[in-house]
């Protein structure tokens, strides 16, 4: 699509979203647009530090868990001694960026608002890891904590998956993987999905939206996909294009959050419409005036805090 034909997104976003966009971090170096992935990861981690301060304090523990690919780092947040359930959180970042630190505040707020134990899984990033390694690491971590629940003082009788952006795809893909392969890790009570991608290759919002402000141009999306997938056939896998999976039965209750000016918004709309058409429990909420990745900015945006509260309330309502 000719760039001039796209919507003037930065003129249309909400006042609080504009404040975020215009927030400068003087000590931050320029984004290494032509740099290596390692340099981009370093920048992303530095940039997110500002947005992760002043998060709720609670007991937190770090553990490494075994998988067939090696050990994976996890971080457990304990908001209370007797948690009613455990939520596994998968961070976003286009499969190539992000870690437990970049999403620490999100996980702490989710634990605080739900009063459920939250476990962040630091799955191996792409292109070092190719599909479906990240999903298999997530499932392995889930199984490990299910088997060792007493040792870690967690309640694994009821669990959930949550994630933002690429992490939302991993969250739903992991839940479907457990269902399809009949793996018992406790009852999956719900899945919380913030502005994810679920398999669309083109859409109205992908044409009208996306730019340098969100890193979601058509070229960006292609780059993330090429880094994540092992081969062309993976594009049609039911654990990458989730619309190729069976969404007509036994899908855990899904909270689907969309950002108004997100090029991935149609993925969320289609997921909701598909699940609702087949009487699968789901809820969709659109957050007006927001860009992709707005969940990070709860330090400054009431809407981001609201979206986290909404997801937490949806999950606890399923327990």
From Swiss-Prot:
EC number: 3.1.1.-
Motif (Involved in the stabilization of the negatively charged intermediate by the formation of the oxyanion hole): 91-93
Disulfides per UniProt: none
Keyword Cytoplasm: yes
Alphabetic keyword roster: Cytoplasm, Hydrolase, Serine esterase
Record keyword Manganese present: no
A GO CC term attached to the entry: cytoplasm
Catalytic site: 165, 262, 292
Matches recorded under InterPro entries: AB_hydrolase_3, AB_hydrolase_fold, Acetyl_esterase, GDXG_lipolytic_enzyme, Lipase_GDXG_HIS_AS, Lipase_GDXG_put_SER_AS
Localisation: Cytoplasm
Enzyme class: hydrolase
GO function term, MF aspect, one: carboxylic ester hydrolase activity
Entry function: Displays esterase activity towards short chain fatty esters (acyl chain length of up to 8 carbons). Able to hydrolyze triacetylglycerol (triacetin) and tributyrylglycerol (tributyrin), but not trioleylglycerol (triolein) or cholesterol oleate. Negatively regulates MalT activity by antagonizing maltotriose binding. Inhibits MelA galactosidase activity.
PANTHER family found in the cross-reference section: AB HYDROLASE SUPERFAMILY PROTEIN C4A8.06C, ALPHA_BETA HYDROLASE FOLD-3 DOMAIN-CONTAINING PROTEIN-RELATED
Subunit text: Homodimer. Interacts with MalT and MelA.
Family of the protein in this entry: Belongs to the 'GDXG' lipolytic enzyme family.
Protein name: Acetyl esterase
Gene name for this UniProt entry: aes
């Amino acid at each position: 699509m000719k760039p001039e034909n796209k919507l003037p997104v930065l003129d249309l976003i909400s006042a609080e979203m504009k404040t975020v966009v215009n927030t400068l971090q003087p000590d931050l170096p320029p984004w290494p647009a032509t740099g290596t992935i390692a340099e981009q990861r370093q920048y992303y981690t530095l940039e997110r530090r500002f947005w992760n301060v002043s998060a709720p304090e609670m007991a937190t523990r770090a553990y490494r868990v075994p998988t067939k690919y090696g050990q994976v780092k996890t971080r457990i947040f304990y908001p209370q001694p007797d948690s009613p359930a455990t939520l596994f959180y998968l961070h976003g970042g286009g499969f190539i960026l992000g870690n437990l630190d970049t999403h620490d505040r999100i996980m702490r707020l989710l634990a605080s608002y739900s009063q459920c134990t939250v476990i962040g899984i630091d799955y191996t990033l792409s292109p070092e890891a190719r599909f479906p390694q990240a999903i298999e690491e997530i499932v392995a971590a889930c199984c490990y904590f299910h088997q060792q629940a007493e040792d870690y003082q967690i309640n694994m009788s009821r669990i959930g998956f949550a994630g933002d952006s690429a992490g939302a795809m991993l969250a739903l893909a992991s839940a479907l993987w457990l269902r399809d392969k009949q793996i018992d890790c406790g009852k999956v009570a719900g899945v919380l999905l913030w502005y994810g991608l679920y398999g669309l290759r083109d859409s109205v919002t992908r044409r009208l939206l996306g730019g340098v402000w969100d890193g979601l141009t058509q070229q960006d999306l292609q780059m993330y996909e090429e880094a994540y997938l092992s081969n062309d056939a993976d594009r049609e896998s039911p654990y990458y294009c989730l619309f190729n999976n069976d969404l007509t039965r036994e899908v855990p209750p899904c909270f689907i959050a969309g950002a108004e000016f997100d090029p991935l918004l149609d993925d969320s709309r289609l997921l909701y419409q598909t699940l609702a058409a087949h009487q699968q429990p789901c809820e969709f909420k659109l957050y007006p005036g927001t860009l992709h990745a707005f969940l990070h900015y709860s330090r400054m945006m009431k809407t981001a805090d609201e979206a986290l509260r909404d997801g937490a309330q949806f999950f606890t309502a399923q327990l």
